[in-house]
Regions:
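Class I S-adenosyl-L-methionine
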Residues: 1-116
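Anionic-ligand binding region
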Residues: 119-124
């Protein structure tokens, strides 16, 4: 069982990485911040995921309850964040809790809004 912190990119569902999209599609449990991550990014999981949970209105303790339940059942978790989860993300506090409990995790980078905006400007 692994928790995958997946960067969803700058908001355009077509800008998520191939690896991020594959992990979302294949993870039985998906936790995403609905206030920041467009629901369309999770469309690839429809019909595959057992649970898709919007974490925008719940706190870290509640998020951890969902992760711990998945861990107890041996199910991978896609924890989807906006942009790149390591840049202005809130994964540090989650990672500390996972490490305390011996739960494996992996960080999957996403396209940051900074990188995307440079491309959208069309300038060098």
């Amino acid at each position: 069982m692994t928790v995958y912190f997946i960067g969803a990119g700058p908001g355009d569902p077509e800008l998520i990485t191939v690896k991020g999209q594959r992990l979302i599609k294949n993870s039985p449990v998906i936790l995403y911040a609905g206030s920041l991550v467009p629901r369309e990014i999770l469309d690839v999981a429809e019909g595959h995921a057992e649970k898709i949970i919007d974490t925008a209105s719940i706190d870290l303790d509640e998020i951890m309850v969902h992760i711990e339940a998945a861990h107890a059942e041996g199910k991978d978790v896609a924890r989807v964040h906006s942009g790149d989860p390591s840049v202005y993300g809130a994964i540090g506090e989650q990672i500390r809790r996972l490490e305390q409990q011996g739960i494996d995790y992996e960080v999957i980078p996403g396209v940051t809004a900074t990188s995307a905006s440079a491309a959208w400007l069309g300038k060098e």
